[in-house]
């Protein structure tokens, strides 16, 4: 077995941070849309936003443009850990399974994607909780990243930092298990068919496709995960709303209808689409560097 290749880890982290910075305001609107309208949480019961564009304009007008980047620090920290581990582990697992990229199959890539998604998301979960809590605040973020981190730990303990970890792992298994294999297989078939070469156009089309498929597959889990992470669970055992993952899913469906599970779909897709395009274009260019 060849030595571990460090390049996918570094390139994956750099490309992930670049993509996160370019699409973060869309991600923030997705979070705001997903947490509103909860009948069992008075703080988020009001329907403040009619859609993604309305959310962007209202947040910018009422809270200032800086509010559109509330939570960017933990988001970048998350990508530095999650993105680095995800891509590096995925590429490493593929090389363990088969030596040559040409021998890869959809099944191998899906299994490698699921495993890398679960591992990386579990490790990076505290930064995800922190990002969502900061995004959910309807005013200027108080205390910054460190202050919010300390606040979560003091009020909820270590468990608070890993709140929703099972959902995060499930979502990552779906997203990574779908997006990376779809990108690889789409790119492979476009090149082998002779329709396109290994060019920016191929990378663009492949990344657009995987972003759409990933958004469709992951949105219901993402809604439940966002609500669970945003929920306060105090040290004395009191909980502000949902009893667990299944309860959150059922209450959301029962109280708000099935399509509530697709709240935030448009910003989710409009984020995942550009996010994947920026990520893969950056990643493919970094791969060409002679290091």
UniProtKB/Swiss-Prot annotation:
Keywords, comma-separated and alphabetical: Acetylation, Membrane, Mitochondrion, Mitochondrion inner membrane, Repeat, Transmembrane, Transmembrane helix, Transport
Subcellular location: Mitochondrion inner membrane
Pfam families xrefs: Mito_carr (PF00153)
Transmembrane regions listed in the UniProt entry: 9-26, 71-89, 106-124, 164-183, 204-224, 264-283
One biological process term in Gene Ontology: inorganic anion transport
Membrane topology: Multi-pass membrane protein
A single Gene Ontology CC term: mitochondrion
Reaction equations catalysed: sulfite(in) + sulfate(out) = sulfite(out) + sulfate(in); thiosulfate(in) + sulfate(out) = thiosulfate(out) + sulfate(in); sulfate(out) + phosphate(in) = sulfate(in) + phosphate(out); oxalate(in) + sulfate(out) = oxalate(out) + sulfate(in)
Sample GO molecular function, one term: solute:inorganic anion antiporter activity
Main location group: mitochondrion
Family annotation (InterPro entries): Mit_carrier, Mito_Metabolite_Transporter, Mitochondrial_sb/sol_carrier, Mt_carrier_dom_sf
Modified sites of kind N-acetylserine: 2
Repeat (Solcar) residue spans along the chain: 7-96, 104-189, 198-289
UniProt subunit comment: Interacts with VDAC1.
Similarity field: Belongs to the mitochondrial carrier (TC 2.A.29) family.
Task of the protein: Antiporter that transports inorganic anions (sulfate, sulfite, thiosulfate and phosphate) and, to a lesser extent, a variety of dicarboxylates (e.g. malonate, malate and citramalate) and, even more so, aspartate. The sulfate/sulfate exchange is much higher than the phosphate/phosphate and malate/malate exchanges. The transport affinities is higher for sulfate and thiosulfate than for any other substrate. May catalyze the export of sulfite and thiosulfate (the hydrogen sulfide degradation products) from the mitochondria, thereby modulating the level of the hydrogen sulfide.
Protein name: Kidney mitochondrial carrier protein 1
């Amino acid at each position: 077995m060849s030595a571990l290749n460090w390049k996918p880890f570094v390139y994956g982290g750099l490309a992930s941070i670049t993509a996160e910075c370019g699409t973060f305001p869309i991600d923030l609107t997705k979070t705001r849309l997903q947490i509103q309208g909860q009948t069992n949480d008075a703080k988020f019961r009001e329907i403040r936003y009619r859609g993604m564009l309305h959310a962007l304009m209202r947040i910018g007008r009422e809270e200032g443009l800086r509010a559109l980047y509330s939570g960017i620090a933990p988001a970048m920290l998350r990508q530095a850990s999650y993105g680095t581990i995800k891509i590096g582990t995925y590429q490493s697992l593929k090389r363990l399974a088969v030596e040559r990229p040409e021998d890869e199959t959809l099944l191998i890539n899906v299994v490698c994607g699921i495993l890398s998604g679960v591992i990386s998301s579990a490790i990076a979960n505290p930064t995800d909780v922190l990002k969502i809590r900061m995004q959910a605040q309807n005013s200027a973020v108080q205390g910054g990243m460190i202050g919010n981190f300390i606040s979560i730990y003091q009020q909820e303990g270590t468990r608070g930092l890993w709140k929703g970890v099972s959902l995060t792992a499930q979502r990552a298994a779906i997203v990574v298990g779908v997006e990376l294999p779809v990108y690889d297989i789409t790119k492979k078939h476009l090149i082998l068919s002779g329709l396109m070469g290994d060019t920016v156009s191929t990378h663009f089309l492949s990344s657009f496709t995987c972003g759409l498929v990933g958004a469709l597959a992951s949105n219901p889990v993402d809604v439940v995960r966002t609500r669970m992470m945003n929920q306060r669970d105090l040290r004395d055992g009191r909980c502000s709303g949902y009893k667990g993952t299944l309860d959150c899913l059922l209450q959301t469906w029962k109280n708000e209808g099935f399509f509530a599970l697709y709240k935030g779909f448009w910003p989710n897709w409009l984020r995942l689409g550009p996010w994947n395009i920026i990520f893969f274009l950056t990643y493919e260019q970094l791969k060409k560097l002679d290091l």
